[in-house]
């Protein structure tokens, strides 16, 4: 994929909330009209096959597609210091700088105060448009959401080949809780677990499992 003189871009993440697995943040540099033209929509509204189809189109057509994988150990470091939003902003800043020619970036803010989150993003000469739920209204952010989700789902599938089925990885999933309980009872939490999550702290401090 080449670069052009001026690009818009969208940024979004997948996997902020799970207790298992990495978070993936992606940027797509293109145009909203072209992203909309291939039928891009919020990844949560798509089937896995629909996401896969659009992912292939985005990667083949968009001038800039980049992603970063944030491992549980790094997430834990920042969460234990109350800095998860700052961690996302650091990674987003790196992605923006990696997309040559980007002049305007739409960001899906994880912070309920988008202007506060905007202040964490360290880039120059780029117009930042930071919104809540941007993946629902901005095609480029939807495209980034699709890229992040497909990449993370692929990683999760590979992790299950190594560690067995742990469900979705979200604390609300009984299969996830069952896997966590099994690992805790065996005395070893694998490195794919986010130890900073309250779910883990409750389970390791409880005698009810």
UniProtKB/Swiss-Prot annotation:
Q: Where does a divalent metal cation bind?
A: 12-13, 108
Compartment list? Cytoplasm
RNase H type-2 domain ranges (all copies): 6-209
Which keywords appear in this protein's UniProt record, sorted alphabetically?
Cytoplasm, Endonuclease, Hydrolase, Manganese, Metal-binding, Nuclease
Lineage, top-rank taxon, reads: Archaea
Q: What enzyme class is recorded for this protein?
A: hydrolase
* Cofactor(s) this protein requires: Mn(2+); Mg(2+)
Under the heading CDD domains, the entry gives:
RNase_HII_archaea_like
Question: Which Enzyme Commission number(s) are on file for it?
Answer: 3.1.26.4
Q: Which GO terms describe its cellular component?
A: cytoplasm; ribonuclease H2 complex
- Which SUPFAM superfamilies does this chain map to? Ribonuclease H-like
GO:BP terms for this protein?
DNA replication, removal of RNA primer; mismatch repair
Signal peptide segment? none
UniProt-recorded Gene Ontology molecular function terms: manganese ion binding; RNA binding; RNA-DNA hybrid ribonuclease activity
Give the protein's biological function. Endonuclease that specifically degrades the RNA of RNA-DNA hybrids.
Question: HAMAP family per the record?
Answer: RNase_HII_A
Q: Which family does it belong to?
A: Belongs to the RNase HII family.
Q: What is this protein called?
A: Ribonuclease HII
Q: Which gene encodes it?
A: rnhB
């Amino acid at each position: 994929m080449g670069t052009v003189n001026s690009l818009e871009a969208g940024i979004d993440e997948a996997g902020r909330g799970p207790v298992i697995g990495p978070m993936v943040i992606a940027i797509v540099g293109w145009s909203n009209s072209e992203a909309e033209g291939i039928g891009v929509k919020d990844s949560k509204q798509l089937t896995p096959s629909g996401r896969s189809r659009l992912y292939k189109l985005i990667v083949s057509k968009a001038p800039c597609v980049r992603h970063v994988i944030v491992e549980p150990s790094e997430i834990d470091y920042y969460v234990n210091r109350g800095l998860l939003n700052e961690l996302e902003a650091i990674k987003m800043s790196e992605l923006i700088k990696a997309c040559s020619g980007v002049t305007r970036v739409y960001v899906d803010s994880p912070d309920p105060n988008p202007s506060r989150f905007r202040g964490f993003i360290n880039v120059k000469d780029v117009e930042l448009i930071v919104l809540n739920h941007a993946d629902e209204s901005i095609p480029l952010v939807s495209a980034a959401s699709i890229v992040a989700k497909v990449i993370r789902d692929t990683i999760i599938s590979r992790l299950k080949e190594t560690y067995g089925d742990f469900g979705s990885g979200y604390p609300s999933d009984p299969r996830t809780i069952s896997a966590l309980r099994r690992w805790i009872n065996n005395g070893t939490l694998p490195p794919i677990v986010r130890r900073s999550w309250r779910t883990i702290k409750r389970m390791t401090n409880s005698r009810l499992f």
